[in-house]
Amino acid sequence: MPFLHGFRRIIFEYQPLVDAILGSLGIQDPERQESLDRPSYVASEESRILVLTELLERKAHSPFYQEGVSNALLKMAELGLTRAADVLLRHGANLNFEDPVTYYTALHIAVLRNQPDMVELLVHHGADVNRRDRIHESSPLDLASEEPERLPCLQRLLDLGADVNAADKHGKTALLHALASSDGVQIHNTENIRLLLEGGADVKATTKDGDTVFTCIIFLLGETVGGDKEEAQMINRFCFQVTRLLLAHGADPSECPAHESLTHICLKSFKLHFPLLRFLLESGAAYNCSLHGASCWSGFHIIFERLCSHPGCTEDESHADLLRKAETVLDLMVTNSQKLQLPENFDIHPVGSLAEKIQALHFSLRQLESYPPPLKHLCRVAIRLYLQPWPVDVKVKALPLPDRLKWYLLSEHSGSVEDDI
């Protein structure tokens, strides 16, 4: 194995120097080290730095000196001892020295331990802010994006010029790392994602496997089916917050392929994901494929297919609720469309007690499509588009207009999506 030789050298060759360096700083066991912020340590730091400097000058010509001071630099990065690290760097420590087990450099370790001041020191000494490790190909920015506790390091790396859109060999950027590392329950990388987006992260980034910024959200929504209700609520809240951020920075939730389209997924399960779907439509998301139109997939077709596949009976409350939510979704589609785009061969064959209502709903859409939209409808759509992004209803209510006109501008089903979630 490639690192066995490194182990042997640590133990028999430069480990004594590493131990001496740690000892000069009053560090006996880094794994069990007490807080370095305690007054007794801070008060004696000056004298410890002098002892360290004398030790390094005395050992400067000893065998494996550079390996020893470079390995000690990894310990300083882990503990956040910037003054000691600065001394080691001025006495020959190698910034590119890799941990023999993880192959991480001091910069990677500083990020993993959330030591932003150490990150800045290392970069100012010449560390490559975009360097990737040899095993996982993770950049410092990738590592910083994966945990909410590393937000200070993420901010510092961006301030120091880290490439926010650099991708690994699989095409994965820091934004995709932040999304993939979030589970919506224990790990919420919302602020990391916000910071990356504000720093210019590309919302169109796609891996070689086809993963997009919506892949994680679609996966997490699937995890809510049949799971713990409390966890499902947390996941839904996280998915809403992240979707809102992504849309605000230009992400398109209605692009092909269908299995990577958040709008398509929400339409397929509109009863379950109703609040998020309502938010998408009120935010201006296309209800058809945004690349190929209704010929690829159509929200109208998906909604009616779902209605017609639900047998139901007169007393079936779930079917009545399904119909109510379908009417809401269809109303939002109409409200935000200058001209309806119904799919070709848009025929339906409903069954059950609500078949007549479904047929009437279908007929009304056919009627709307067959006539030119009235001017008042075009004005309504134009004003609502102008007031985006979401929440449009709040902005409509703030307009200096008569209440009757405000009522017309509002969708019949506008409401607080955030409260629903």
From Swiss-Prot:
Post-translational modification: Ubiquitinated by RNF41; leading to proteasomal degradation.
CDD domains: SOCS_ASB6
Primary site of residence: cytoplasm
Entry's free-text remark on domains: The SOCS box domain mediates the interaction with the Elongin BC complex, an adapter module in different E3 ubiquitin-protein ligase complexes.
ANK repeat intervals: 67-97, 102-131, 136-166, 170-205, 226-255, 260-289
Domain SOCS box per the UniProt entry, residue ranges: 360-415
Subcellular location, record wording: Cytoplasm
One term under GO cellular component: cytosol
Functional description taken from the UniProt entry: Probable substrate-recognition component of a SCF-like ECS (Elongin-Cullin-SOCS-box protein) E3 ubiquitin-protein ligase complex which mediates the ubiquitination and subsequent proteasomal degradation of target proteins. May play a role in the regulation of cell proliferation and autophagy by promoting the ubiquitination and degradation of SQSTM1.
Alphabetically ordered keywords of this record: ANK repeat, Cytoplasm, Repeat, Ubl conjugation, Ubl conjugation pathway
Domain of life: Eukaryota
Gene3D superfamilies for this protein: Ankyrin repeat-containing domain, SOCS box
Biological process per Gene Ontology, one example term: protein ubiquitination
InterPro entries tied to this protein: Ankyrin_rpt (IPR002110), Ankyrin_rpt-contain_sf (IPR036770), ASB6_SOCS (IPR037327), SOCS_box (IPR001496), SOCS_box-like_dom_sf (IPR036036)
Quaternary structure note: Binds APS. Identified in a complex with ELOB and ELOC. Interacts with CUL5 and RNF7. Interacts with SQSTM1.
Pfam family, one: SOCS_box
Official protein name in the record: Ankyrin repeat and SOCS box protein 6
Pathway the protein contributes to: Protein modification; protein ubiquitination
Family the UniProt entry places it in: Belongs to the ankyrin SOCS box (ASB) family.
Entries under SUPFAM superfamilies matching the protein: Ankyrin repeat, SOCS box-like
SMART domains documented for this protein: ANK, SOCS, SOCS_box
